[in-house]
C-alpha cells in the first residue's frame, strides 16, 4: 500500500497566524481566548471566543478576496503557507495528480444574514451583489482555493461537524493510497461570527461562567468547566505519497500511519464514548508502535470530556499515554479543529515537546490517574502521536502520526 506523509502545513488560529507563532504559543501555554464585543452587544450569555488577530482582506488580492467569506480567507492564507512550507512549485501544485479536500463545519451565517437583510431594503435583490453565493455555499472553502491556486486534481469539501477537517485529512490519505492523487491539500476552516455563535449559546453548549476571565473559560478536565469556547480559523496540511516526497527532497514532518472514522449511532449531540473507542482502535490497527501522546478532543464540556476519557481508558487500560487538550488554549474551531489539532500535534512531534492542558485548577474526579499534562513537557521522547476529533451526530475521527526515520 502507498504510504503517506505530511510535508508541509499552514495555519491561522487564535494562538497565531503562522506555524512559528503557534509553536511559541503552544510551548508557552498561551491562551488565544478573548471577550468579543459583538457577543456582548447581541446580549449573548457567552461573551468569549478564540479570536483571529488579523484582517484577511489586508493579505489577499482584492479580486480573489471578493468571492470569500472569512472561513475561505483563513483557508486560503493557510494553504499559501502550506505550499511555501512544503516547497512545492507552481507546476507541482497545478497538475492532475494534486488535489484539494477542504471543509467547514458550518456555512457562513454572517454572509447569509447580510444577504437576507439586504433584500428587505428598497433596492431588493439588487442590494445583495454577485458574490453572496460563493461566500455562503457549502463548498466555499474548497472552491475559493481551487480556482486561485489552479488545482486540477480532486476539488471538493467534506463536512462532518467538529470532525470535518480530520476526516478531510483521512480522506486525503485514502485518495493517495488508492493511487488517485500524489499530493492532496487537506484541512478546514471556520468563520467566527456572532450569527453562528449565538446558535451554540442558545443550546447551552458554550461557556458562560468565565466572561470576566476569558483566558480561563476553556478548561477541559477541570471540575468547574461549563461548556466549550467557540473559535475560528483555518488549517491546511500537505498530504503526500512517500516516494513522491522523497524524490523531490521534501522535509517530512511525519508519516500518517493510522486513520479511524466511525459513527456512534447513539444521540444527536451526546457522545456515546463507545464510538470513540472503536475509532481509536480502528486507527491503531495499522500502527506497530506504542502511542506516546494523545491530543484529545477535550472541548471542556461536562459530558464529552468524561466520555472521551472513558474511551481512552478502555482502549489503553493501565497504559494511558500522556494526554492534553490544546482547546484549553485555543477554544473550539468547529470544522477547522481537526486540522488545527493535527498541526499542533505535528509541531509537538517535530519539536519533541507536549503542550499543556491549561486551566485545570480542580481536577475532575473522572480524570484521576489519566496522565494529563498540565505543564509544558520538553524532551518528551515522542515517536507516535494521536489526535482525536468528534462531532455532533456521533461522528468520530482519529489520526495517528509517526516520526519518519527513513
Curated annotation (Swiss-Prot):
Catalytic activity: a fatty acyl-[ACP] + malonyl-[ACP] + H(+) = a 3-oxoacyl-[ACP] + holo-[ACP] + CO2; (3Z)-decenoyl-[ACP] + malonyl-[ACP] + H(+) = 3-oxo-(5Z)-dodecenoyl-[ACP] + holo-[ACP] + CO2
Cysteines paired by S-S bonds: none
Class of this enzyme: transferase
Family statement drawn from the similarity comment of this UniProt entry: Belongs to the thiolase-like superfamily. Beta-ketoacyl-ACP synthases family.
Single GO term (MF): 3-oxoacyl-[acyl-carrier-protein] synthase activity
EC number: 2.3.1.41
Subcellular location: Cytoplasm
Ketosynthase family 3 (KS3) domain mapped to chain residues: 1-403
Assembly: Homodimer.
Pathway annotation: Lipid metabolism; fatty acid biosynthesis
Keyword flag Disulfide bond: no
Protein name: 3-oxoacyl-[acyl-carrier-protein] synthase 1
Role of this protein: Involved in the type II fatty acid elongation cycle. Catalyzes the elongation of a wide range of acyl-ACP by the addition of two carbons from malonyl-ACP to an acyl acceptor. Can also use unsaturated fatty acids. Catalyzes a key reaction in unsaturated fatty acid (UFA) synthesis, the elongation of the cis-3-decenoyl-ACP produced by FabA.
Main location: cytoplasm
Keywords: Acyltransferase, Cytoplasm, Fatty acid biosynthesis, Fatty acid metabolism, Lipid biosynthesis, Lipid metabolism, Transferase
Keyword Kinase among UniProt keywords: no
GO biological process, one term: fatty acid biosynthetic process
Organism: Haemophilus influenzae (strain ATCC 51907 / DSM 11121 / KW20 / Rd)
GO CC annotations on file: cytosol
InterPro entries in the record: Beta-ketoacyl_synthase (IPR000794), Ketoacyl_synth_AS (IPR018201), Ketoacyl_synth_C (IPR014031), Ketoacyl_synth_N (IPR014030), PKS_Beta-ketoAc_synthase_dom (IPR020841), Thiolase-like (IPR016039)
Active site residues of this protein: 162 (for beta-ketoacyl synthase activity), 297 (for beta-ketoacyl synthase activity), 332 (for beta-ketoacyl synthase activity)
Amino acid at each position: 500500500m502507498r504510504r503517506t506523509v505530511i510535508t508541509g502545513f499552514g495555519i491561522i488560529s487564535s494562538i497565531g497566524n503562522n506555524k512559528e507563532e503557534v509553536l511559541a504559543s503552544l510551548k508557552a501555554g498561551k491562551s488565544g481566548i478573548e471577550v468579543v464585543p459583538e457577543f456582548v452587544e447581541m446580549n449573548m450569555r457567552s461573551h468569549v471566543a478564540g479570536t483571529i488577530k488579523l484582517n484577511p482582506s489586508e493579505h489577499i488580492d482584492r479580486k480573489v478576496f471578493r468571492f470569500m467569506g472569512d472561513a475561505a480567507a483563513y483557508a486560503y492564507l493557510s494553504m499559501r503557507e502550506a505550499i511555501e512550507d512544503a516547497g512545492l512549485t507552481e507546476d507541482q501544485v497545478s497538475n492532475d495528480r494534486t488535489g484539494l479536500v477542504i471543509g467547514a463545519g458550518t456555512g457562513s451565517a454572517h454572509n447569509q444574514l447580510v444577504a437576507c437583510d439586504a433584500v428587505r431594503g428598497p433596492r431588493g435583490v439588487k442590494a445583495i451583489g454577485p458574490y453572496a453565493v460563493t461566500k455562503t455555499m457549502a463548498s466555499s472553502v474548497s472552491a475559493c482555493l481551487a480556482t486561485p491556486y489552479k488545482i486540477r486534481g480532486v476539488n471538493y469539501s467534506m463536512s462532518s461537524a467538529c470532525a470535518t477537517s480530520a476526516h478531510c485529512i483521512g480522506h486525503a490519505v485514502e485518495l493517495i493510497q488508492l493511487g488517485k492523487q500524489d499530493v492532496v491539500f487537506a484541512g478546514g476552516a471556520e468563520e467566527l461570527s456572532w450569527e453562528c455563535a449565538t446558535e451554540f449559546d442558545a443550546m447551552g453548549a458554550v461557556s458562560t461562567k468565565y466572561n470576566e476571565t476569558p483566558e480561563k473559560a476553556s478548561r477541559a478536565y477541570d471540575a468547574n468547566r461549563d461548556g466549550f469556547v467557540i473559535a475560528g480559523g483555518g488549517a491546511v496540511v500537505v498530504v503526500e505519497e512517500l516516494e513522491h516526497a522523497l524524490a523531490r527532497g521534501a522535509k517530512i514532518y511525519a508519516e500518517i500511519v493510522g486513520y479511524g472514522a466511525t459513527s456512534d449511532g447513539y444521540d444527536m449531540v451526546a457522545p456515546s464514548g463507545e464510538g470513540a473507542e472503536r475509532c481509536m482502535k480502528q486507527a491503531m490497527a495499522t500502527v506497530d508502535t506504542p502511542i506516546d501522546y494523545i491530543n484529545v478532543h477535550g472541548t471542556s464540556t461536562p459530558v464529552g470530556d468524561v466520555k472521551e476519557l472513558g474511551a481512552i481508558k478502555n482502549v489503553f487500560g493501565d497504559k494511558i499515554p500522556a494526554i492534553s487538550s490544546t482547546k484549553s488554549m485555543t477554544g473550539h474551531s468547529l470544522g477547522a479543529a481537526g486540522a488545527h489539532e493535527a498541526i499542533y500535534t505535528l509541531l509537538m512531534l517535530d519539536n519533541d515537546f507536549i503542550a499543556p492542558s491549561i486551566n485545570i485548577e480542580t481536577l475532575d474526579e473522572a480524570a484521576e490517574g489519566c496522565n494529563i499534562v498540565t505543564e509544558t513537557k520538553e524532551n518528551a521522547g515522542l515517536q507516535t502521536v494521536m489526535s482525536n476529533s468528534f462531532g455532533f451526530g456521533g461522528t468520530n475521527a482519529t489520526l495517528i502520526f509517526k516520526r519518519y526515520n527513513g
